[in-house]
Amino acid sequence: MKQIVANQKVKIPEGLTVHVKSRLVTVKGPRGVLKRNFKHLAVDIRMVNPRVLKVEKWFGSKKELAAVRTVCSHVENMIKGVTKGFQYKMRSVYAHFPINCVTTEGNSVIEIRNFLGEKYIRRVKMAPGVTVVNSPKQKDELIIEGNSLEDVSSSAALIQQSTTVKNKDIRKFLDGLYVSEKTTVEVDEI
């Protein structure tokens, strides 16, 4: 039997404003503004009241109905981003040649030097709105921060992929920069 309608609601916390205009969702919060375009999905996105966003799909296939929850998850990540922010921690792993990481251009570009003893300098540019710094507390650790989860995670992925070992047995040569922790910038007090 075909499902007639699938709908989900997202509760919006106090202190945030969410605008929806033709499937373009804008979330404003204390850490900034995030916009996301959902025009590629044929779903209804509307504000029921200033504190509730409703996403629904009528007479959809299984895949189209699944997109309803996906949109809600993206909006929840945007809400989390403008309230708490996202933070990824990366550690450099090396057996012999110590990897040297230097941030330049206002913490938006990272230069990776001495990877496997190579002279080549790897430069990785962060996504807009993402900063990278060397951790003051922990040796060989990078901290990547930003409001957009997609931008922070893709920047971390670019750093990790820039230090892939070529033409060697990757089980033996484990050198590189790897994500060690995923958290928010502002941590909840327990």
UniProtKB/Swiss-Prot annotation:
- Gene of origin? RpL9
Q: Name one GO cellular component term.
A: cytosolic large ribosomal subunit
Similarity annotation: Belongs to the universal ribosomal protein uL6 family.
The record, for PROSITE patterns, names: RIBOSOMAL_L6_2 (PS00700)
Would you kindly state one Gene Ontology biological process term found in this protein's UniProt entry? Answer: cytoplasmic translation
Q: Which SUPFAM superfamilies match?
A: Ribosomal protein L6
* GO terms for MF: rRNA binding; structural constituent of ribosome
This protein's species is: Spodoptera frugiperda (Fall armyworm)
**Which keywords does this Swiss-Prot/TrEMBL entry list?**
Ribonucleoprotein, Ribosomal protein
**Highest taxon of source:** Eukaryota
InterPro entries, alphabetized: Ribosomal_uL6-like (IPR000702), Ribosomal_uL6-like_a/b-dom_sf (IPR036789), Ribosomal_uL6_a/b-dom (IPR020040), Ribosomal_uL6_CS2 (IPR002359)
Q: Does the keyword Ribosomal protein apply?
A: yes
Q: What is this protein called?
A: Large ribosomal subunit protein uL6
Q: Does the keyword Ribosomal protein apply?
A: yes
